[in-house]
């Protein structure tokens, strides 16, 4: 967050597009630490089942950002201008740094030494070779990618098919974000009652149903706004339900590599989502057909990845 603070100040003083892009890149590098370290801290502080519940509620809180950010961002831009936005970023970063210094204790075991670059790479190889880790990481990756497929062309698609304005699409996006929050909240509640594995399967079932409904909606003539929006709401709910549980499971089996596992699983998800977003933009033709096909593919791959993770878990149980 100190890097984010410095980058925010640089962005506020930028005099060219290149400087602004560089500052924004450094902001992303700084703030990305939060998602990785948060998961490692949770893994260090809780046993697997409570950790999944904790991550579910953390994910729900993080899901609030897409709902309130556009509203507050628009108001702040009108009040203080675009440079003022970055001063606000810096102020928030300073507050977070102060809070971290005051209330956050070190959760890493005292007898754990810092890893060298070679040890980090060796740890990454161990994780990639582990069917359980790769299964959970890919489940999260493909579930996340399905959301990025829609995000890439969603505004243009809704404007073309239904004539929605930017403000109206912003409202729709807020509702979808609320659906994601509801899914993440439900993940914590259901995992306590059903267990993590069964809850993930419920989420995958909802994801399959949502994808099938979106495929039908993509070829309906005339296109129906309600069917499209229902399928996307279900998709975001499933995303919120599965993501925290898959992320928690990805760091369970190798607690000594919790930080590496958290960073690697997030990196894989970003790469997969970026690839799907690029493909979506390249094949977009003004219809939802391309999105539907890609969503069906990511849904099938998420099912395969979850089967891979469950198979690895069963093998470990038998050996034990």
Task: Set out the residue ranges of the language-model regions.
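Helix-loop-helix hairpin linking two adjacent transmembrane segments in secondary transporters
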Residues: 19, 48, 56-102
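Cytoplasmic helix-loop-helix junction between adjacent transmembrane helices
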Residues: 23-64
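A late C-terminal transmembrane helix in Major Facilitator Superfamily
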Residues: 247-286, 295
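C-terminal transmembrane helical hairpin of 12-TM major facilitator-type secondary transporters
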Residues: 200-244
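Helix-to-loop junctions at the C-terminal end of transmembrane segments
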Residues: 183-197
């Amino acid at each position: 967050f100190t890097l984010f603070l410095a980058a925010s100040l640089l962005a506020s003083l930028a005099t060219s597009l290149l400087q602004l892009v560089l500052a924004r890149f450094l902001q992303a590098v700084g703030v990305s630490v939060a998602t990785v370290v948060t998961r490692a801290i949770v893994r260090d502080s809780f046993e697997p089942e409570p950790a999944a519940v904790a991550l579910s509620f953390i994910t729900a809180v993080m899901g609030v950002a897409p709902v309130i950010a556009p509203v507050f961002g628009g108001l702040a831009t009108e009040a203080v201008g675009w440079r003022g936005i970055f001063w606000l970023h810096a102020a928030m970063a300073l507050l977070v740094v102060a809070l971290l210094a005051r209330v956050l204790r070190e959760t890493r075991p005292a007898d754990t030494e810092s890893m060298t670059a070679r040890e980090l790479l060796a740890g990454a190889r161990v994780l990639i070779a582990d069917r359980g880790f790769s299964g959970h990481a890919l489940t999260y990756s493909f579930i996340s990618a399905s959301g990025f497929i829609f995000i890439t062309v969603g505004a243009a698609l809704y404007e073309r098919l239904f004539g929605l304005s930017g403000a109206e699409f912003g409202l729709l996006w807020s509702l979808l974000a609320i659906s994601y929050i509801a899914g993440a909240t439900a993940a914590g509640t259901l995992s306590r009652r059903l267990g993590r594995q069964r809850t993930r399967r419920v989420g995958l079932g909802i994801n399959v149903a949502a994808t099938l409904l979106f495929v039908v909606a993509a070829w309906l003539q005339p296109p129906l706004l309600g069917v499209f929006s229902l399928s996307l709401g279900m998709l975001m709910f499933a995303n919120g339900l599965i993501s925290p549980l898959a992320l928690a499971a990805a760091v369970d089996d190798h607690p000594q590599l919790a930080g590496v596992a958290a960073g690697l699983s997030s990196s894989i998800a970003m790469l997969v989502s970026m690839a799907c977003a690029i493909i979506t933009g390249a094949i977009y033709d003004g219809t939802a057909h391309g999105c539907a096909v890609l969503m069906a593919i990511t849904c099938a791959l998420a099912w395969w990845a979850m089967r891979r993770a469950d198979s690895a878990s069963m093998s470990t149980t038998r050996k034990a």
